[in-house]
Amino acid sequence: MKKTLLIILFLIVSLGSFAQLGEFVVIGNNTGFKASTKANAKAIFRGKYSSWKNGESVTIVLPSTKSDNVVSVASQVYGLTVKGMQKYWLEQVFQGRSNAPVFFETDEEIINYVKRNPGAVGIVRASRSVPQSLVIQITE
C-alpha cells in the first residue's frame, strides 16, 4: 500500500512539473513558442537570447529583491544567491551581453507586464492564476 501511494505521489509531482520550472511557471507573450526544455528555459532567463525566432526582442521579467520568492528564483533558475543573481545581471548588462531584466515585486505585476509587452518572458509561482495563453510548457 505504501509503495502504491509513493508511486502515485511521484506521478502527481512529475506531471505537475511538466509545465513548471520547479515551483514556478514560465510565462511569455509573443515569444514564438509554447514549449521549451528546462535547459533552454534557464538559458533564456540567463540572457542567452536577445530576440525570439519571430523577431520580437526578448524582455526578461523577474521578481525584485523585495519579492518574497526572489530567493527561490535565484536558487532554482540561476543556481545562485540573490546577491549572486544581481551580480550576474550587472556583469551581463555592463559587458553588453544582455539588456537588463525588468523587476517587479509581485507575481501579479509580472503577469500584467508580460501580458502587455510582446516578447516579454517571466517567471511566477505555480500557485498563481495565469492565463493559459501565456504559459510556456517546460519539459525535461
State what each model feature region is:
Residues Q20-E140:
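Flexible loop/hinge segments at secondary-structure junctions
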Residues T4-G16:
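Sec-dependent N-terminal signal peptides
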